[in-house]
C-alpha cells in the first residue's frame, strides 16, 4: 500500500502552464485517468495533488479543477497542496480561504524558479509564519545550493510543518553527492521538516540508473530525518523522464528490501496519514 503525496495533473485545455513551453518532454496532457490506472496497479490507494506552477491568476482554478476530479466515484485524490505567493500582499486573505476548504492540505511556492532572496523578504517570511497553527503544510522545492536559506526560513517559522520535496533535488546525474549530503544533514536538524522521497528518478541518468544508483541518496535522507519524518511521492508525470511510475515503485520496493515492516509502512503511508490527517 502506498499513499502518493506528490501527483501532478496537467490538463492544458483547463489551465495555463507557462513553464511547459520550456519543458518539451512534459508539454502535453497528463490526465488523472491515465495516472489512476497505473497507480492502482502499483498499489497506490490515495494521492495528494501537488500544484503544477500554473499561471498565478489560475491558482484557485487549479484547486477547483482538481477538487472536481476528486468528487468522482472511486477517485484516489484525497486532497491538494495548492500554489501560493507568500511574497505578495494578498496572501493573508488567500490563506483564510484555503483554511476553510477541507480539501486543501497545504501550500507550495517553488523557490528554485525565482531569485534566491525571495524567501528572505520580510513579507514572505511574515506570511509563511501565518501558516503556523492552521494544520496546513508548506512544501519546499529548492536546489542543494539553497539549503542554508531553507534552514533559515524553517528556523523563523517553528510552528509551521515543512515538507522538503524530492530529497532536496540532488544532482544524481553528475554524482554531486557531497554538497547535497551536507545540506540535507543541516535541514534535517530542524524537527518541523519532513522529507519527501520522490522525484529522484528524474535527476538520474535516464538510460543507466538502477536502484543502486539511488540508494545512497535515499539512505542518507532516512538516516538524517529518521523513519518518522519521511513520506513517499511519485512526482508523476515528471517521473516519466526517468522510467515512469511503475519503475519508481519497483525501485522503491528494491531499496526497502529487508527493511522492517513497521518502518516501511511509515514511509509508504503511515506518516502521510498522520501529517495530513487522512
Regions found by a protein language model. Give the residues of each.
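Conserved, mostly hydrophobic/aromatic
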Residues: 6, 47, 66, 80, ...
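Mid-to-C-terminal alpha-helical segments outside catalytic/metal-binding sites
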Residues: 1-3, 26-46, 220, 225-231, ...
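An N-terminally biased module of ancient metal coordination in phosphate/nucleic-acid-related enzymes
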Residues: 1-67, 250
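Active-site environment of divalent metal-dependent phosphoester hydrolases
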Residues: 10-13, 54-57, 87-90, 112-115, ...
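Active-site gating/metal-coordination segments in enzymes
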Residues: 60-146, 152-154, 196-200, 207-208
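Short, electropositive alpha-helical surface patch
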Residues: 57-76, 160-164, 214-223, 245-255
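Catalytic pocket-lining loop regions of alpha/beta-barrel enzymes
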Residues: 118-231
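A generic "structured core" feature
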Residues: 1-10, 40, 112, 122-123, ...
Amino acid at each position: 500500500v502506498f499513499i502518493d503525496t506528490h501527483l501532478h495533473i496537467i490538463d492544458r485545455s483547463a489551465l495555463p502552464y507557462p513553464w511547459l513551453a520550456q519543458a518539451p518532454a512534459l508539454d502535453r496532457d497528463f490526465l488523472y485517468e491515465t495516472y489512476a490506472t497505473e497507480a492502482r496497479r502499483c498499489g497506490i490507494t490515495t494521492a495528494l495533488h501537488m500544484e503544477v506552477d500554473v499561471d498565478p491568476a489560475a491558482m484557485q482554478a487549479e484547486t477547483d479543477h482538481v477538487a472536481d476530479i476528486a468528487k468522482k466515484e472511486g477517485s484516489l485524490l484525497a486532497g491538494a497542496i495548492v500554489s501560493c505567493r507568500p511574497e505578495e500582499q494578498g496572501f493573508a486573505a488567500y490563506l483564510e480561504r484555503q483554511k476553510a476548504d477541507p480539501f486543501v492540505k497545504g501550500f507550495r511556492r517553488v523557490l528554485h524558479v525565482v531569485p534566491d532572496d525571495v524567501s528572505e523578504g520580510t513579507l514572505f517570511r511574515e506570511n509563511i509564519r501565518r501558516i503556523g497553527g492552521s494544520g496546513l503544510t508548506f512544501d519546499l522545492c529548492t536546489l542543494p545550493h539553497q539549503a542554508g536559506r531553507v534552514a533559515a526560513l524553517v528556523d523563523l517559522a517553528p510552528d509551521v510543518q515543512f515538507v522538503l520535496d524530492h530529497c532536496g533535488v540532488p544532482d544524481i546525474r553528475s554524482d554531486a553527492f557531497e554538497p547535497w549530503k551536507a545540506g540535507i544533514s543541516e535541514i534535517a536538524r530542524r524537527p518541523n521538516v519532513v522529507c519527501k522521497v520522490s522525484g529522484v528518478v528524474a535527476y538520474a541518468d535516464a538510460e543507466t540508473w538502477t536502484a543502486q544508483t539511488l540508494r545512497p541518496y535515499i539512505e542518507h535522507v532516512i538516516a538524517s530525518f529518521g523513519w518518522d519524518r519521511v513520506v513517499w511521492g511519485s512526482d508523476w508525470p515528471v517521473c516519466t523522464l526517468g522510467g515512469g511510475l511503475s519503475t519508481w515503485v519497483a525501485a522503491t520496493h528494491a531499496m526497502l528490501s529487508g527493511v522492517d515492516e513497521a518502518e516501511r509502512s511509515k514511509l509508504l503511508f503511515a506518516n502521510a496519514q498522520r501529517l495530513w490527517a487522512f
